[in-house]
Amino acid sequence: MYNQSPSRRSAMGAGVILALAIGLGAVEVQAQQTIKIAAGAPLTGALAKPGQEVFNAVQLAVEEWNAKGGVLGMKIEVVAADDQGNPQVGVAAAEKVAADASIMGAVWGITSSTCIPASEVLEKANMAFITPGCSNPKVTDRGLKNMHRLCARDDFQGPAGIIFAVNDLKAKKIAIFDDGTTGPRGAADEAEKQAKAMGVTALRYVLRAGDKDFRAVLGTVPKDVDAIYASVWAPDAALMAKQLPDVNLKAKMIGPDGQFEPVDYVQAAAGAAEGNYVTFFVPDMNKIPAAASFVKAFEGKYGQISSYGPIAYEGANILIEAIKTAGKADRAAIRDAVRASKHKGVLGMEITFDAKGDVATPSLSVYQVKGKGFELVKTVTK
């Protein structure tokens, strides 16, 4: 697994270093050879594949900047922060990042449960936090100055899945699942609200992430449901798809962004996911002229783009552009420059942030599982 170790820290206690880093706010960089940004994601564990794609995309952006001379006259270095998709681990990783005064900001997160506490650590250190995939509304509703989200919120994504189920699939009775964790539960909550608002019967269920047999819960679902909104991550969605026939459930699944994984979902389901639907934050990259060079470079180095890579790449470029705009290695100035960003990159649209730090013009694409991957069905904007 491609991974870059964090820089060595002094023998001082981590708490003392963190206090110094927060207190200083800026770091003298004239004598330095590099300037650092962090890439935070689950780099080990069940969500390592999408997490590693986040890191790889940030690394690619940095390599491209370095090939042009870096930023502020210095080369850029990526520091890996493995949060394992675990809130406690994420906080510890964020504390290490905040304690390193040479790290100017972070592109971080695909799990909201980890993103929320980790961003609070970096907020105290005045560090910009840009997330490519943490979609729970609470991420930005807290009003943090450092928090920036490039993906759509779950109060857009959850309803979009239900609207598609009702209007396009003509569903009238929908089973809604989540795994009990912050991100998936948030999308499921919003999906349930939308279903009730549309006069559709919504039945709620909870699965435990990582279980090897969901049939006891799946077997309680009425056989006449028209659709299944499954707000779970890709590995669990694959298992669900394989076990639905065992309990005589024939309805198609609709899932949020965490299922946009050709390997961990589609291929792991071994054909059982065929025809299911997934909403994701990125349109078909092969149809965006501005994305051609990115797609070629990324896939030439790391293989097929599967999920959060394009958004993380945008995040890294926004962060580095903010460092350039700030004109100095000052965390607070860089944080403020991120909030004022106007960036047009590989997603084919101008990215700006609203007062909360949400992307101002979110969009979602609905994909259908076909063969070993996904085919675009439609794109919806808020």
Which positions does each model-derived feature cover?
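Bacterial N-terminal signal peptides
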Residues: 13-25
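Short, polar/charged alpha-helical segment
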Residues: 50-72, 189-196
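Segments of small-molecule ligand-sensing domains
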Residues: 297-309, 320-373
